Amino acid sequence: MRDLKTYLSVAPVLSTLWFGSLAGLLIEINRFFPDALTFPFF
């Protein structure tokens, strides 16, 4: 039961960090390449 509580307390923290970094990455891409439907570096 203790392992389940540890998992349930770690998963929200990791998902918050993951989605926060993903949102930051998308914001920075949109800052350098505004309104890009296709990215020019591909």
UniProtKB/Swiss-Prot annotation:
Disulphide linkage map: none
Any single GO BP term: photosynthesis
Annotated keywords: Chloroplast, Membrane, Photosynthesis, Photosystem I, Plastid, Thylakoid, Transmembrane, Transmembrane helix
Compartment list: Plastid, Chloroplast thylakoid membrane
One cellular component (GO) term of this entry: chloroplast thylakoid membrane
Alphabetical list of Pfam families matching this protein: PSI_PsaJ
Keyword Nucleus: no
Record has Transcription as a keyword: no
Transmembrane segments: 7-27
Main location: plastid
Membrane topology: Single-pass membrane protein
Gene3D superfamilies according to UniProt: Single helix bin
Its biological purpose: May help in the organization of the PsaE and PsaF subunits.
Protein family (similarity comment): Belongs to the PsaJ family.
Xref: PANTHER family: PHOTOSYSTEM I REACTION CENTER SUBUNIT IX, PTHR36082
Annotated protein name in UniProt: Photosystem I reaction center subunit IX
